[in-house]
Amino acid sequence: MAIILGVDPGSRITGYGVINCVGRQQVYVGSGCIRTSSDELPLRLKQIFDGLSEIIRQYQPDEFAIERVFMAKNADSALKLGQARGAAIVAATAANLPVAEYSATQIKSAVVGTGRAQKSQVQHMIQQLLKLPSAPQADAADALGVAVCHYHTNQSLAAMGGRANSRTYGRYK
């Protein structure tokens, strides 16, 4: 049994999703969004750190997975996203959680079956996979997708006799 916290980072909205993995089953535990209220980036980063630290205390996850930074057309947006990821990763490492990173393509492939899936397709598949009464909000669905991707990656590696490691899957120690 493992509880996985998945995070879809953003400087304004950071989605989180928690699943409990029992054998080959993934059970929905909780999800939501941390919406930052300040216009000043340092205060938004603190809100992300504090919010995820509280979520970690509440759900007591065993593992933490986060979406990797993608290349953005706007360099300023990419930098802010990277800083939001940093705040999230520090919250995880402060709680001694192993951190794994996955690209958007890996996440979409694990959830939908194609790396070019639309957000609405991810929402629909997360609803189906986790047997939810309705589709979660987009950022929360993406975060649940990160957790599902991490579960499937570890299941595949376990079948081959291993687990995600720091070189291959971007874990921090």
Curated annotation (Swiss-Prot):
InterPro entries: RNaseH-like_sf, RNaseH_sf, X-over_junc_endoDNase_Mg_BS, X-over_junc_endoDNase_RuvC
Catalytic residues, chain numbering: 8, 67, 139
UniProt binding sites for Mg(2+) 2: 67
Primary location group: cytoplasm
Keywords tagged on the record: Cytoplasm, DNA damage, DNA recombination, DNA repair, DNA-binding, Endonuclease, Hydrolase, Magnesium, Metal-binding, Nuclease
Gene Ontology terms: cellular component: cytoplasm; Holliday junction resolvase complex
Location within or outside the cell: Cytoplasm
Swiss-Prot/TrEMBL cofactor(s): Mg(2+)
Cofactor, free-text remark: Binds 2 Mg(2+) ion per subunit.
EC number: 3.1.21.10
Disulfide bonds, paired cysteine numbers: none
SUPFAM superfamilies, per the entry: Ribonuclease H-like
Subunit: Homodimer which binds Holliday junction (HJ) DNA. The HJ becomes 2-fold symmetrical on binding to RuvC with unstacked arms; it has a different conformation from HJ DNA in complex with RuvA. In the full resolvosome a probable DNA-RuvA(4)-RuvB(12)-RuvC(2) complex forms which resolves the HJ.
Record-given protein name: Crossover junction endodeoxyribonuclease RuvC
Gene designation: ruvC
